[in-house]
Amino acid sequence: MKIHVAKTAEELGAQAAHTIAEKLCEAIAESGEARLVLSTGGSQFETLKALLQEDVPWDKGTAFHLDEYIDLPITHAASFRKYLKERFIDHVHLKEFVFVETEGDVDDNIRMLTRRLREKTIDVGVIGIGENAHIAFNDPPADFDTKQAYIIVNLDSRCKKQQVGEGWFK
């Protein structure tokens, strides 16, 4: 593991974006395509902003959305689909973006996501760690031995407090 220390969020975001771009370009050079998983949250603001400036052939990329609130419409300020569309997807021309759809039959959507995610190797995962050490809403104590690619989780109180504190919910 490599640890990079940065003085500002902007510097850290630029470092992360450059590394992500390098890995995506390597995957495209090797196999003609790249697959990445994107998360959201305040920790991703600067990374996604800087990633838009990187020279990546996005038309050879398929991206997957990591998580979403159940039954939250895409128009809601806290929607991760809205977050990714506004900050990333609407600015690059990906081959495909696979959203976590949480409206409708959630179990069917989870099965589809799992199938799609497992079709080929994921080249890059862009994730953050929350204030309570959650990774993609897998709050402690999460079952990290699950074989499911996507699961429904119950957020712990610290995670809920973080979401409100960051301004996603009023």
Task: Give the residues covered by each predicted segment.
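N-terminal glycine-/serine-/threonine-rich phosphate-binding loop
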Residues: 1-36, 107
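Class I SAM-dependent methyltransferase SAM-binding "motif I" and its flanking Rossmann-like core
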Residues: 136-170
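Short, glycine/charged-enriched secondary-structure capping and boundary segments
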Residues: 51-54, 77-80, 112-113, 135, ...
